[in-house]
Amino acid sequence: MRLTQGSNAFLLGVLVVGLVVVLFLFGDTRSRRSVHISPEKAAAIEFSKWPTWTTVEPPDQRIRILWVLHDYVPFVNAGSEICAHTINTHLMYKPYKFDVWVASPGFPKRTFENVRCFDLHDQETFTQVLASAHQLHSHSYIYRKQMLFLSRITGKPFVEWVHTDNYVRSVGKQWNDSRLEGRQWTVFNSKSLRSSRADLPEATTKIFLPIVDYRDYAIDKEKKTPKYVTLSNVNDNKGGNLLIQLAKALPDMEFQGILGGYRKQIVYSGLPNLKYVQHTTRIKDVYATTWVQIMPSKEETWGRTAVEAMSSGIPLVVSSTPGLRECCQESALYCDRADLDGWVTTLRKLKEDSAFYNSRSAVALERARALDPLPEMEALEAWLEKEVAPSLRPGRLPTLLEKNILFR
């Protein structure tokens, strides 16, 4: 009797374990995430006007690009997401040549500014788009291994967009997958970041600066009410602590911090000359009230915010990272991140010397115009069409098992 009971218990245990394994491997048990859209957010982004779609039609002669991203605008408006969307919307100005899709966890199945978006965990839609795509793109390190795997089995080129020092450190020594046979492409956002991986082959490595069109951020003089020293994204790396120190040291000046979409935000209440505002898609409203833009970053590989601010003629005070030096050149004033007195002295000079302030405004605007992105975009289009596209190879789609465990 004991043997029978023990055998039954053993068999039951085997069945339970087997069921769990089957559900894990073949059931749709992946983690889910929904993008929460509050009524206020929906109104701000005019969500009700976003077209819905149901059909994944053939791309015909167009180059179909599939991005796989952990976040996307307008729900997260960080630099990488804005950069990807700017590229996508530009490519979609030529819908006869390019067709861009974005898969991101929880994203509603809608078209946002001509780019069709959907939930990464919508397995049926993902498979349909993947099957018809010609290129795979991503800047999300958390999906890097999955993208390399998909490129390997499908034969589709993988374009890897690199924006941060942390991304480079995370990849480590072994960057390229030799099994991809010339279809693994890497794009760095600056010369300084590219130099951190000088070992990568020139043939499959490019530099494309983040696209910021000064025309999109220019603010008419009559709409400007410059008042604040502004810091965008108040996490530790961007200088959230220094913003608080400056507000304490300069009680006669007004400061504002824009809450960012990633990393812990450093905030402080109780200072009458310091306020915080939510990050927004209406960033020109922020620049219209900005007197000086500060960027006391510990790491900054380029400086999209800097170019946006310069486009409005806003003087810049920044830390001396290689990326900010490359981006701003002589158009910014540089201070050591750890030198509070240096920041205080520089801001006081801008406040007390109007001629100096006006000259810094003029050189900022000149630099923004010098960074006209149109030639850069034309070069990107040609590269995608003439170099990346021909690297497409025959392949296969993921199996049911592979699809189910791919983005857990």
Give the positions of each predicted feature.
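Conserved acidic donor-binding segment of nucleotide-sugar-dependent glycosyltransferases
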Residues: 234, 332-340, 349-354
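Short His-centered aromatic/hydrophobic patch
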Residues: 138-144, 162
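Conserved catalytic-core segment of nucleotide-activated headgroup transferases in glycan assembly
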Residues: 199, 213-270, 276
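Short hydrophobic beta-strand element within catalytic cores of glycosyltransferases
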Residues: 315-318
